Design a protein with these regions (language model features):
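Long, contiguous secondary-structure blocks with strong helical propensity
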Residues: 89-93
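Hydrophobic helical h-region of N-terminal Sec-dependent signal peptides
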Residues: 11-20
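Gly/Ala-rich beta-loop-alpha elbow adjacent to hydrolase catalytic centers
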Residues: 84, 88
């Protein structure tokens, strides 16, 4: 017997809502010409030792990366190439775009979780990720990876295989969004038919990538709870004593930023010795054939 209180069209309306929700649960396949892509890495060559900075995964603990940049900049140490994964990719993109540590710090202190996290009801995760993409693209003035002031590698992982992908070309914000898409929390990011998730799935601190990009001295910043074995490929590993909290908890950003600055300052003597030794032992760079002399 039909319930007279239920409109006859309600089941059809519910079905329509579910169908529309189903359409919204599939990640968009990004196939535009500016979609992020991986190309063979070209080592950077300079007449002095090349410094690589690797900023690791760690959610909101990634605010410590900003403190590390402050300490390095104060000491006159300027990275030549940058590698970022997950929250580290956000800071790495801003640094590679030419922002100074004070500018990144000011942006971080203004940041609210709602600026980055767009929660959804339907979908393969609780957070869609578009706000994060837009935030990064605005910070880098909508420049693609290859047009930033410094070489930048953004690390993501293929969802099906967990294999590492190193994005060095294309839309910076979209690459960072893929790198930070924590499985089951964020929607995966689909690029040219392949779904990508948080780069920390493949490597939380991919120090070896900086070597492949030509770094003579690799500085790795590990903000993960358990530490990352991949950081061992670095010459100097900075491990800030961050506050343990949910990866989306921004309430400890001041403490984490200070922890990053303190840890980097402690590492400065070791780093300065390494830089001096590398400069003394570096062979001269030979001019390329045909180059004007």
């Amino acid at each position: 017997m039909n319930n007279p209180k239920i409109p006859a069209r309600l089941p059809a309306l519910l079905l329509a809502v579910l169908l529309l929700a189903g359409c919204a649960t599939a990640p968009v396949n990004h196939v535009a010409a500016d979609a992020p892509r991986a190309v063979p890495l070209q080592p950077l060559v300079k007449p002095r030792p090349v410094i690589g900075l690797v900023l690791g995964a760690g959610g909101s603990r990634g605010f410590a990366h900003v403190g590390v940049l402050k300490a390095l900049e104060s000491a006159g140490i300027e990275p030549d190439i940058v590698v970022g994964v997950s929250s580290g990719a956000v800071v790495a993109a801003m640094h590679a775009a030419g922002l100074r540590a004070a500018e990144i710090e000011a942006s971080a202190l203004r940041l609210e979780d709602s600026d980055l996290l767009d929660f959804t009801v339907f979908g393969p995760g609780r957070i869609e990720g578009g706000r994060l993409q837009n935030y990064v693209n605005e910070a880098v003035r909508n420049r693609p990876l290859e047009a930033l002031a410094k070489p930048l590698a953004v690390i993501a992982a293929e969802r099906e295989t967990s294999r590492m992908t190193v994005f060095t070309r294309g839309n910076t914000g979209l690459a960072v969004r893929a790198s930070a898409s924590v499985p089951r929390l964020f929607w995966p990011v689909k690029i040219h038919g392949t779904e990508y998730v948080d780069g920390g799935v493949a490597s939380r601190v991919p120090a070896a990538v900086a070597r492949q990009m030509g770094a003579d001295i690799v500085i790795a910043v590990d903000v993960s709870w358990r530490g990352s074995a991949d950081a061992a490929a670095a010459d100097v590993v900075i491990r800030p004593q961050t506050v343990r909290s949910r990866i989306t908890d921004f309430s400890h950003k001041l403490a984490n930023l200070a922890a990053g600055e303190d840890a980097a300052r402690e590492a400065l003597p070791q780093l300065q010795v390494l830089l001096a030794g590398a400069a003394a032992n570096r062979p001269p760079v030979r001019p390329r054939p045909g180059a004007a002399g």
